[in-house]
Amino acid sequence: ILTGPNPHIGIQLLDELHLLQEILPEVSNMKGVRQPENFHPEGDVFVHTLLCLSKLVPATEQGMERPSFPLAMGVLLHDIGKTVTFEELDRIRFNLHEKVGAYMTAKICDRLKTSNAEKERIIWLVLKHLYFKDAQKMRLNKLKRLFANEGYPELAELCRIDALASSGDLSDYHFCQEMFSKLSHEEIKPKPLITGHDLIVMGLKPGPLFKDILTKIEEEQLDGNLTTKEAALKEVRTLISQMKTVLK
C-alpha cells in the first residue's frame, strides 16, 4: 500500500473500512488533532499526513524508482507524536513530538515485525524530521554528521514532502541539498586525525575522557578548524591542560 501508487488512497480506504483503527490505531488517532493554521493551512494531522503520502509518487522522480519502505513509513509516522503532545495554551504546541513519535514508532515497528535495519531507519527519520528547520543555523560539524548518515537522502525527501504538504517553504531543503552537493565524501566523512591509540601514547588511560576528547577533536575537524594530526595533538594537549586546571 505505502510504496505503490496512491498510498494516500490506500490509507483512506483502510480508514473507511474501519481497518486502520485495528492495524494502526496511532495513525487513526491523528484524525481531529488540530494544527496551527499559519503553519498548517491544509488541516489536521491526519489530513496533513495523507497530503504527504500523496506526494510520495512524485518523489520517485528524485532518483528512486519507487519510495523505499522506510521512507514511506517515515512519511506516514513522522507526526505521530502530535497525537499525545497536543497542547493549547497561548497557541497550539506539540513539544518534543519528534522524540515521542520516535518512541511510538519503535513500538509500531515491533508490532509489525519490521527488520531491525528498517526499524532503525524509520525511527531515525521520525526523530530527525525537524532537523532541516534549524539547518541554516547549525554548525558545519553537525550538518556533516547529518549528511554522513546513509539515510540522509530519505530524510531530505521526507523534509521536502513535509514542507510541500504544509507551508510550501522549501528554503531549508534547498539549503541542505546545496550544502550536501558542495561537500565531497572526504569532507563529510574524513579519516580521523587521531585515534584512541594516540591518546594512550600521550599517557592517557582509556576511559570516559577518551570519548569526550575524540568527539571534540572530530567536531573541530568537521568544522575545518583542524586539518593535520599535529594540530589535533596540540589541541589535545590544550584540552588536557584545561581539564587539569578545572580539577585543581
Show the residue positions of the predicted features.
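Conserved, hydrophobic alpha-helical core segments of structured domains
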Residues: 1-160
